[in-house]
Amino acid sequence: MSIKRYSSTADTTITNAYKSSLTTRGTGSNMGAADILEVFSLTGQESSGSVELSRLLIQFPVSGTATGEIKADRTAGTIPASGSVRFYLKLFNAKHGNTLPRDLILNVQAVSQSWAEGGGLDMENYTDIGVANWVSGNLSGSVGAPVSTKGGWDGAWGTSSMDQTTGYTPGGTYHTAAYDPGSDGMPMYTQTFTGGDEDLEVDVTAAVEEWVAGTYLNYGFGVHLTSSQEAYSVGDGTNVPRNLNGSSDSYYTKKFFSRTSDFFFKRPVL
């Protein structure tokens, strides 16, 4: 049995956490060039009812026609046909000196809107402003419009002006419809981290095959705490999502190595 690895082409952390002053949130901050990806839920830091969340976005070369993309490699015979190969998303745990939550459950969902990786670095004070961030996936402007019947903009490749932030939900926009293979929705995956320091390793074959088939555009995955572990909130309509089934406990903090990590063999792979 042979193994082929695909490295991520973009990844970043997005957050609505407060800056060090505890007066403003870092919702406009970008961390696309940081060497760490971070997921957490923090309650009661700014005030008794405050909610702070962090999620990650990650994308792989799946549906393109250039060498090194999964679809192109299948056409070339480099990887087997659908049904004869499995795809696993793997993120490597990054040890740190902060608290580490046990028994946390992370969801892996397909993202439904384009986003930019960005070049921000600051994961402490959130001073690097840019996209993607908690409230915006990308910039408005001239972009290429790919052929797609679902999950994107119709039309042949060309240049057209469109607002890529339209419809963007703070915290990321994900496929949430019930999954009907080849027809509607995208699968969602979960993993439980009993000790907290485990790597993430999830079989995401179904999602990858949907992207290769062109059912939806490949905007990668979002990884975040399951809703019962993200903080309880009635929502504020802007920065904090409504979550009436959430937790009053904090889950702080889970970290993974990003694609810019100096530890080459700890970078995310598919």
Positions of predicted regions on the chain:
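Secreted, disulfide-rich extracellular signaling modules
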Residues: 1-269
